[in-house]
Amino acid sequence: MTTDAPLPAPGREVHTLDALDSAQAESVLALLSEAARSDGRQAVSEQGRLRIRGGHRDGVRHFLLTVDGALAGYAQLEDTDPVEAPAAELVVHPDRRGHGHGRALGAALLAATGKRLRVWAHGGSSAARHLAQVLGLSLFRELRQLRRSLVPLDLAEPVLPEGVTVRTFEPGRDDAAWLAVNRAAFAHHPEQGSLTQQDLDDRKAEPWFDPKGFFLAERDGEIVGFHWTKVHAEERLGEVYVVGVLPEAQGGGLGKALTSIGLHHLAAEALPTAMLYVDADNTAAVTVYERMGFTTHEVDLMYRTES
């Protein structure tokens, strides 16, 4: 792995913080907005954006790159996975690109993790791929964004397994039970399975949260699966936010039925398009979604160090 230090730049500094104050958070969010307008996509995930305002979170650090005191770049590092290397996302202000700031942030992340690092490149742009190569990172994971039209929604009415009923989420009442089912359903997927009450509260506080689009499947009064939908109002885009089924309830068509229920809900909201994210190596899920009319829209790439 060749990761020569970036050339020094006059006035450039990288500051590492465990939490951001309100002014720093606003500056970072403004930078992210400018980058999203320029790039056509977010450089930092929803979870990462929630952490910017969320104060101190165990295992999370923020890297602010400034030039003559002005914010020019940002990175977030999460070190909560007991097995995998710390994961990072980074972005440079569109007006500050081409000056080695991305490489400087990458070098700071490598130094902070002892050169044991994973980095997301949302959208997999050529610039992001080049930076990964410069930092000595190798492609590790491919996350696909799939989309399909909801006009018309040419899906049959969902058929639930025998004994299963569906209702909508009740905030407060269902929190603990849903978190337990989410942990069990995503025991193999720490990014989703490790969600806490604080993570759930953060999402419930977001303007997009609507319990009418959060469906719970029950058998004998116990939650056995769910489909949480999300509406991106500005883009008029519906999302299959997360679908989960308890391991013991899998294999009977519940996941497909829940997905269909959510898509019918999004179509009833007069949304023209639905989207979802799925790992490319989850071939079974990719096949199911493709049979439901989804096709690949774009790809997020994760790179990691060899060590």
From Swiss-Prot:
GO terms classed as biological process: mycothiol biosynthetic process
One Pfam family here: Acetyltransf_1
Alphabetical UniProt keywords: Acyltransferase, Repeat, Transferase
Top-level taxon in the UniProt lineage: Bacteria
Coiled coil ranges: none
Domain N-acetyltransferase, chain residue ranges per copy: 15-158, 164-307
InterPro entries according to UniProt: Acyl_CoA_acyltransferase (IPR016181), Bact_Acetyltransf (IPR050832), GNAT_dom (IPR000182), Mycothiol_AcTrfase (IPR017813)
Subunit: Monomer.
Function: Catalyzes the transfer of acetyl from acetyl-CoA to desacetylmycothiol (Cys-GlcN-Ins) to form mycothiol.
Protein name: Mycothiol acetyltransferase
Provenance organism: Streptomyces griseus subsp. griseus (strain JCM 4626 / CBS 651.72 / NBRC 13350 / KCC S-0626 / ISP 5235)
Underlying gene: mshD
